[in-house]
Amino acid sequence: MEEGEAKKTGLEGTGLSLPGSSHGNLRSAGSDQQLKQMLDSLKSSKSPAVINYGASWCRVCSQILPPFCRFSNEFKNLTFIYADIDECPETTQNIRYTPTFHFYRDGEKVDEMLGTGEERLHDRLWLHS
């Protein structure tokens, strides 16, 4: 890393070429503070959301991340959040498996999906959208 260059975190920190969200509903938490703010916002907004807890070193996480980003364009009413467990150690200390997906509705966690599978994730997103 060049001196003076900011460390890339969240989705940028993965180093993957990822599709962006044309609807602005894809967010990335690069710190515990950011993730806490996003969780507080979810609780007050009551809009449906999914959080993808992953890690930059997790091969399976890297495989599901491009579809996760793509799905943010398909499911416009869901808020999509990516949180790297190494960048958010306090708020993710209960995450024991990567990737883990948490689904929120009306400010409450209503579902959890461990592991991956593009079709499985798509079906779960459809269910909660």
UniProtKB/Swiss-Prot annotation:
Signal peptide, first to last residue: none
Active-site annotation: C58, C61
Domain Thioredoxin residue range list: 7-129
CDD domains xref list: TRX_family
Region of interest: Disordered: 1-30
Keywords per UniProt: Disulfide bond, Electron transport, Redox-active center, Transport
Disulfide linkage: C58-C61
Comp. bias (Polar residues): 19-30
Biased composition (Basic and acidic residues): 1-10
Role played: Probable thiol-disulfide oxidoreductase that may participate in various redox reactions.
Recorded family membership: Belongs to the thioredoxin family.
UniProt-recorded name of the protein: Thioredoxin-like 3-3
Organism: Oryza sativa subsp. japonica (Rice)
Lineage: Eukaryota, Viridiplantae, Streptophyta, Embryophyta, Tracheophyta
